[in-house]
């Protein structure tokens, strides 16, 4: 036994000596995976993943984990998974783009958001954050015509020693050359979150809170705010609570914007609730959102402090020069 341990220690020392220039493993990584998935990992543990299969109706992020392995989000409405199949955990979409519906999955005039590029230069890994950049086309299902050319960047940034983290979503939306595209007045779009069943107010006894101190759907529904938090139970442990604060950025149109939030477990940040927005190939729409994923039931002061922190971060460059 002693002899075996001696040879093992010699082997380890030898291996270490053979790699004197070995570099530390980057803590936060965006890892390309099979089947059009990019996994965002902290110290090898997946926090979330971007699903960008061109055959899907739209790209989306799932799962979304705090410090436990249980996802804080789900696919579909817990009581109507087929009718709400478009509730894809965390997703970007809109139900009135020209005359097309990109919100639902079975509309009369159906739109689809198709990923067309994830460039190698779009992946960045550091000890502080990881990101990936992609290009999506918003197309008509009927004739495949392009309505919107979207550049999207997802950044994962751990906070407080990884006890919580930001998912920052940067978007640029433009029409094809020579065209004008209109985002109609609606409460459905642009970024939305379907919470886990146990977090919902109706199903799990969770809680909604916005930046104005308003609580749950009767007070929060379609009210302007800087952010909105949805927190609830995800395990039966005494401290088994977690949540997500969805944050709007001051650079976005109509800030502070309305939040479309329901006690049944979903929340969205409205882009054009009452006022349509037009984009062209020159007049592009630049947007920035964040999700603060956290353990526990967030207080108003905690979510507000995180919102301030989010707004003070440098705005990402969506068109960096190739290295």
Q: What are the functions of these language-model segments?
A:
Residues 180-253:
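Active-site/ligand-binding surface loops and adjacent short beta/alpha elements
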Residues 43, 50-56, 60-65, 160-207:
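Acidic (Asp/Glu-rich), glycine- and aromatic
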Residues 88-163:
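Extended, loop-rich substrate-binding clefts of extracytoplasmic carbohydrate-active enzymes
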Residues 55-106, 205-227:
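Extracellular/lumen-exposed scaffold segments
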